[in-house]
Swiss-Prot record:
Reactions the enzyme catalyzes: GTP + 3 H2O = 2-amino-5-formylamino-6-(5-phospho-D-ribosylamino)pyrimidin-4(3H)-one + 2 phosphate + 2 H(+)
Role played: Catalyzes the formation of 2-amino-5-formylamino-6-ribofuranosylamino-4(3H)-pyrimidinone ribonucleotide monophosphate and inorganic phosphate from GTP. Also has an independent pyrophosphate phosphohydrolase activity.
UniProt organism field: Saccharolobus islandicus (strain M.16.27)
Signal peptide: none
Protein name stated in the entry: GTP cyclohydrolase III
Amino acid sequence: MKVLAIKLVDYREWTERLGYDREWLIQKIQNKFMMKIHEIASQYSTFPLQLRFDNLLMIVDGITNTQLIYMINDMQENLPVGIKTCLGYGKTPLEAQWNASVCLNNKEDKFKEYVDEKIAALHFDINFNTEALKYTSVYDSFLEITNIYVDLSRFLYKIGGILQYLGGDNYLGFVSTNSVNKVIEKFSDDNKIKVGIGIGQNARTAIKLATTSLEKIRNNREKTWHIEEE
C-alpha cells in the first residue's frame, strides 16, 4: 500500500511569530487550510488524516506519481508554511506510513514507483452514543469517545491499520484487504460498535463505500458490520 507523509516545515516557528494571543488564531488558520486540503485531496480521490495538523498522512493507492506532484503543488499554494513530503510503501497502511515517516526524517524526497493495491476503509460508529448524551455530560461523553478511540487505535495497530477520529461518535480506519476478516471477527458480536467496510481502488471510493455499508447496517438494525466492494 502507498502512504504519503506530509510535514509542514517550520510550523512551530510560524505559530510563535503570531504573538502571545495566538491560540484562537492558530485554530482559525488550521481549520481554514485543512478545509482547503480536504477539497484538494478529494479532487485527487484521496483523504487527509490530519493527526497533528503539522503532520498529515494520505492513503494514495490509485494515484500516479505525476498526480501526487500536482496535488502537492496545489496544497503548497494554500499553506502558510512550506511542506515536505515522502511516499512510503508497505504491506499494510501502518508499515507504509512508517516507511514514509522514516523517509521524511532522512530528508529524502524522491518518489519511487510502487504497485497500487486496493484500499479497505472502515467507518466505525458507536451505538446509542447520541442518545446517551441525554443522561451524561458533554465532557463525560467526550471522554468515552476518546477511550474508544484509543481502544480502536490499539486494535488496528496490531493488524497493521491506522485510525482517524472524524468527530461526533465516528472514526475512520484503513487496513489492508488481507486484514478485513480480522476486523469482521472482532466486531461481528460487538453490540456497542458497528463498522461499515468499503473496498475500492482509491481512498475516496473506499470511504464512500464504507459509509454506504454503515447506512445499510443502520437500516438493517440486526448486523454489526457490512462490506461493499468496488
